[in-house]
Regions:
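Short secondary-structure junctions
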Residues: 2-20, 76-89
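Amphipathic N-proximal alpha-helical interface segments
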Residues: 17-64, 86-136
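Secreted/surface-exposed cysteine- and glycine-rich disulfide frameworks
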Residues: 63-78
Length: 136
């Protein structure tokens, strides 16, 4: 993922090693303007965070077609209640590309991506992600 984003953006990332940071634990961050890859120490787990609508001239969007800067008010209003959170009057978390749940209520696979919006405008997307991606 780091090599792909480096090629797309056309420049290397700023790399930082964190031995401990809140609930994130030890990890390495690879940052470009508008994107970050966070990889956890000792695992193959990583997440990609996007805070721009395009990288290297390529539009970055969810499989549903949403990009940073898009209005998601109608989408959030139509989404199932468990896929939308409102931590404040102006802030909204919304899950995109949600996997189906098993009869026990667990997801068959992780949520595809989550977005954070202020006043209905998408500010960032994290994939794979969950609400805590924005709280740590």
């Amino acid at each position: 993922m780091v090599a792909l984003l480096t090629d797309t953006v056309g420049s290397p990332p700023v790399v930082s090693e964190e031995t401990e940071q809140g609930c994130a634990g030890p990890h390495t961050s690879y940052q470009w303007d508008g994107a970050v890859v966070t990889a956890w120490a000792g695992t193959t787990a990583f997440v990609v965070g996007i805070t721009t609508s395009s990288l290297g001239g390529i539009r970055i969007e969810t499989t549903g077609g949403f990009a940073v800067g898009d209005d998601i008010v109608a989408f959030a209003a139509a989404a199932p209640a468990e896929n939308v959170g409102h931590p404040s009057d102006s802030d909204t978390f919304v899950a995109f590309d949600v996997a189906s749940r098993t009869s026990s209520g667990d997801y068959e696979s992780p949520v595809g991506s989550v977005g954070y919006a202020t006043d209905g405008v998408l500010q960032s997307i994290v994939t794979p992600g969950e609400w805590s991606s924005f709280l740590c």
